A protein has these predicted regions:
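Nucleotidyl polymerases of mobile genetic elements and RNA viruses
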Residues: 1-258
Length: 258
């Protein structure tokens, strides 16, 4: 962990624990072990501060800011340990069309595939239309439902103890907004994951994988049809760049005019 990254509500940097590990190490280890034993994160570790970071030079609306969550150092250690447990399984879960946070995968691969698919759509001579949908997931972290996260983790066969622990991390958050060098009154969110939480990127790509799984179900049921860049090539229905792309064979025949 970076020693002097912005601290959470407790005001303690990771560097503080690193410097005084001989004094505080045993207490921290006991607390982390207790969380993994009980599968529950205590409320005092759940407290989070939100700071608004401008996305552009001169922000004018709330949409021009990115909310970053400042979590307590001990909480970050817990979620990093959870990430260590689930990261080794991601290669077996995440499709090859997702590249974020997965080792040995390159974003340039998907860029090339997208270009080839769009090129093939442009030169297609069939009398059937094609459709490419670019989905910009605005405020995606804020809009993920907790029930969806639980359903997704169960569907991917994560062990019950990991599911309980992740849901405890996600759904028991007390948040306060930093504003004008002070903290506003805390509130309890009812959905979403935190930007700045080490666990959040992995929950997000798993959620996107579940979306892809649902689309594949539609394709297998012949309700949607994926497309191919060539007759003998693989079929594509969904993959990911910075945005989400969905490639479909449009089920509307083009009628020739007399």
């Amino acid at each position: 962990m970076k020693p002097y990254k912005a601290p959470g509500p407790d005001g303690l940097y990771a560097g503080f624990f690193q410097r005084f590990w001989l004094i505080m190490g045993d207490s921290m280890i006991r607390e982390v072990e207790r969380v993994f034993t009980t599968k529950k994160v205590p409320n005092f570790l759940h407290k989070t501060l939100i700071v608004l970071i401008p996305k552009i030079q001169d922000p004018e609306t709330l949409g021009n800011y990115r909310p970053i969550s400042l979590c307590n150092t001990v909480y970050n250690i817990i979620t990093k340990l959870i990430v260590t447990q689930i990261r080794s399984h991601l290669d077996n879960i995440i499709s090859p069309y997702q590249i974020a946070f997965i080792s040995r995968r390159r974003g340039t691969d998907n860029i090339v595939i997208a270009q080839e698919l769009i090129h093939s759509m442009g030169r297609a001579k069939e009398r059937t239309g094609y459709m490419a949908i670019k989905i910009d997931l605005e405020k995606a972290y804020d809009k993920i439902e907790w029930a969806f996260i639980r359903e997704m983790l169960i569907e991917f066969n994560f062990p019950d103890n990991i599911v309980y622990l992740i849901m405890s991390c996600v759904s028991s958050v007390s948040t306060s907004l930093l504003f004008n060098e002070g903290c506003l009154e805390s509130f309890l969110p009812s959905r979403g994951i935190r930007q700045g939480d080490p666990l959040s990127p992995y929950l997000f790509i798993l959620s996107m994988e579940y979306l892809g799984y649902l689309i594949e179900e539609k394709c297998e049921a012949k309700l949607w049809s994926p497309i191919k860049a060539s007759r003998s090539g693989p079929a594509f229905s969904l993959f990911f760049l910075r945005m989400t792309f969905s490639f479909l064979l449009r089920q509307i025949k083009i009628i020739a005019m007399p």
